Regions:
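Short glycine/proline- and acidic residue-enriched helix-loop micro-motifs
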Residues: 61-76, 99
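Glycine-rich, Arg-bearing micro-motifs that act as flexible, cationic patches
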Residues: 124-145
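Structural beta-alpha unit
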Residues: 1, 82, 86-125
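Short, well-ordered secondary-structure micro-motifs
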Residues: 19, 46-49, 111-114, 137-138
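Conserved acidic residues
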Residues: 4, 123, 151
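Short, hinge-like loop/turn segments at secondary-structure boundaries
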Residues: 51-55, 118-119, 143-145
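Small/aliphatic-rich secondary-structure junction motif
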Residues: 2-66, 93
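Short secondary-structure boundary segments
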Residues: 38, 128-130, 158
């Protein structure tokens, strides 16, 4: 068996979609599972604002206890997973039996992806060369950061 678990970071970009198609081909010849992983910036969920003025889902940030905050984060991750799953609908129907879709939070996407790969036993990462915000002609910052953050082989796809 060449690979057993291939991780595909997914941000909805064309490069991410191409990476998924490439990973599907690799999975077919190596009988591997595919983990599609989307990173939600933790700042979107108010991580950097806890204990300050303002509110998150109508609850004053200074009054959130751990359980309340955990519930808000879980709801944000669930909502993001729902959107990603909808976005992937036409792309994963043919591999539904070997694919999982996960959403993780992190302040740095590359580090969050590296942690996921290490924690979940991924033996290959197939990702787009550039994401939604990358400058044309350059290796994306997440791709570059992931290369430095993990020992798992990273294959970038145009």
């Amino acid at each position: 068996m060449l690979y057993s678990k291939i991780m595909v970071p997914y941000d909805g970009s064309e490069h991410a979609k191409h990476a998924l198609e490439y990973a599907k081909g690799l999975a077919a010849i190596s009988d591997a599972k595919i983990a599609i992983v989307h990173v939600v910036p933790s700042g979107v969920m108010g991580v950097d604002q806890i204990g300050t003025e303002g509110s998150l889902d109508g609850v004053p940030l200074g009054m959130l206890n751990y359980e309340q905050y955990e519930g808000v984060v879980r709801a944000a991750l669930d909502q993001a997973k729902e959107k990603v799953t909808e976005n992937l609908a036409g792309l994963v129907e043919d591999i539904a039996n070997i694919v999982t879709i996960d959403v993780v939070a992190g302040t740095a996407p590359a580090e969050a992806l590296a942690r996921y790969a290490d924690k979940n036993g991924c033996d290959l990462i197939v990702m787009g060369r550039r994401g939604l915000g990358a400058i044309r002609g350059m290796l994306g910052s997440v791709s570059f950061g992931l290369l430095r953050s993990t020992d798992v082989p990273v294959l970038t796809v145009k």
